[in-house]
């Protein structure tokens, strides 16, 4: 990270696909056009079994990056098995379709939850994550059946995240 911040502008893109889908922008518009030199293009949170793809947009940094990758232990012995997932992931914009679906499921969940008087959204819903508060007893009941994180336990703020495989039935059942 020190090398990255000293030499270039980088972005850790675990949810960059969701941002592209939500903003209706291309990956280029959210990276290269904004001055990003290196992107960790996330796949695990958007449908891949595992793996992130490091994309180096700045040609001057590409040669040195091969060595930095090894020094920071980011070279899996069977990299080709991890990498081959990206062929399908990038074909026909599957990465973008998965993200758009996750965002749509979050929007559906938001529309239902905003009608509940005990729910207050703490951040404007923009992608596949919802941040909200509700009474602690309600949260405790929900935790018996669903897994989610406290974002700020002091004020009962939780984070709900939808994904590429969240179905409308999942959302309806949660509601």
List where the protein language model places each region.
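Single conserved hydrophobic/aromatic residue that forms the stacking wall/gate
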Residues: 1-7
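General beta-strand structural signal in soluble alpha/beta enzymes
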Residues: 8-13, 39-42, 122-123, 150
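A short, charged helix-loop
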Residues: 14-22
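Glycine-rich nucleotide phosphate-binding loop and flanking beta-alpha elements
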Residues: 17, 47, 138
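Active-site C-terminal subdomain of aminotransferase-like
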Residues: 21-22, 26-129
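Conserved C-terminal alpha-helix-loop-beta "cap" of PLP-dependent enzymes
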Residues: 107-175
């Amino acid at each position: 990270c020190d090398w990255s911040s000293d030499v270039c502008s980088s972005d850790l893109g675990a949810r960059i696909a969701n941002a592209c889908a939500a903003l209706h922008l291309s990956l280029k518009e959210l990276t290269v056009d904004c001055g990003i030199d290196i992107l960790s293009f996330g796949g695990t949170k958007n449908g891949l079994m595992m793996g992130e793809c490091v994309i180096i947009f700045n040609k001057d940094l590409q040669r040195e990056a091969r060595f930095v990758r090894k020094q920071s232990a980011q070279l899996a012995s069977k990299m080709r098995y991890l990498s081959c997932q990206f062929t399908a992931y990038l074909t026909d914009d599957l990465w973008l379709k998965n993200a758009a679906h996750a965002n749509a499921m979050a929007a559906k969940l938001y529309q239902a939850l905003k009608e509940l008087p005990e729910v207050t959204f703490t951040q404007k819903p923009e992608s596949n994550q919802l941040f909200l508060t509700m009474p602690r007893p309600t949260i405790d009941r929900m935790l018996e059946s669903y897994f989610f994180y406290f974002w700020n336990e002091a004020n009962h703020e939780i984070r709900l995240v939808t994904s590429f495989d969240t179905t409308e039935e999942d959302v309806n059942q949660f509601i």
